[in-house]
Regions:
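Glycine-rich phosphate/diphosphate-binding loop of Rossmann-like nucleotide-binding domains
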Residues: 13-79, 91
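Flexible, glycine/charged-enriched surface loops at secondary-structure junctions
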Residues: 9-14, 60, 223-231
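Solvent-exposed alpha-helices and their adjacent loops that cap or buttress functional pockets
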Residues: 8-12, 66-68, 89-91, 138-140, ...
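Short, well-ordered coil/turn residues at beta-beta hairpins
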Residues: 20-21, 100, 175
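Glycine-rich phosphate/nucleotide-binding loop
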Residues: 106-207, 212-243
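A glycine- and small/hydrophobic-rich beta-loop-beta segment
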Residues: 63, 71-135
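Internal gly/pro-rich beta-alpha loop/helix module
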Residues: 1-6
């Protein structure tokens, strides 16, 4: 059973937890940007639950309208690159990394210096990939316990398990977006997967789901079972293991 909200649970006492939350923004011109519907509510709820469980918590946040939980250190960023830099800065000494942010996968190669005018019927934007923050942390040595999120519109389990294995995560929390779930909503439902197991967290308020997720993370962290960071690096860069 979940501990009541606000209880003095110490499941994460003495641990440093680093969380990303919210969306990122990638500038097109001075007045336009590419972003997504993430409200940051789930990431902030996880931060609150981890703090209530006794952890030292740092949250690296994209632009959101969510209050910072008491006792949580907040680092505000805007772009995926800024989020990556902030995560790198706070990663040393981190025991658990939880990637709850909805990070832009692409960014404009050359943002316009001035507002783009309507001069034609179409507009082509050259885009480049942003750094994969989750994969980068998963390949770090020494490596924290790495938890990813998978927000999917279809084939949730298949896509989540593919991400779990492909990025060699310790755990992934998956949910289907839409139908008043996940993005910009107060409720959520998650299926949590790890190598060899899973746990359902049924639909409830995000704070309750977050408390359940933190409980599962603490249980798995306590087992001492970890996925190898060396393998994660070799997956991202074939031949790395031979260096």
């Amino acid at each position: 059973a979940l501990a009541p909200r606000g209880s003095a649970s110490a499941a994460m006492a003495g641990l440093k937890v680093l969380i990303t939350a919210g969306p990122t923004r990638e500038r097109i011109d001075p007045v336009r940007f590419i972003t997504n519907r993430s409200s940051g509510k789930m990431g902030y709820a996880v931060a609150e639950a981890a703090r209530a469980a006794g952890a030292e918590v740092v949250i690296v946040s994209g632009p959101v309208n969510v209050a910072t939980p008491a006792g949580v250190q907040r680092v505000d960023v805007e772009t995926a690159e800024q989020m990556m830099d902030a995560v790198r800065a706070h990663l040393p000494g981190t025991d658990i990394f939880i990637a709850a942010a909805a990070v832009s996968d692409y960014r404009p190669v050359q943002p316009a210096a001035e507002k783009i005018k309507k001069t034609s019927d179409s507009l082509m934007l050259a885009m480049s990939r942003t750094t994969d923050i989750l994969a980068t942390v998963a390949a770090t040595e020494p490596r924290p316990f790495v938890v990813g999120f998978a927000a999917e519109t279809q084939n949730v389990e298949r896509n989540a398990l593919g991400k779990l294995a492909g990025k060699r995560l310790d755990m992934i929390a998956a949910n289907e977006v839409g139908d008043r779930l996940a993005f910009d909503c107060d409720d959520n439902a998650l299926t949590v997967y790890w190598p060899g197991g899973k746990r359902e967290l049924p639909r409830a308020a995000k704070r309750e789901v977050a408390a359940g997720l933190v409980e599962v993370i603490a249980e798995r962290f306590a087992t001492g079972e970890r996925v190898s960071a060396v393998a994660a690096e070799s997956d991202r860069n074939p031949g790395a293991a031979a260096r």
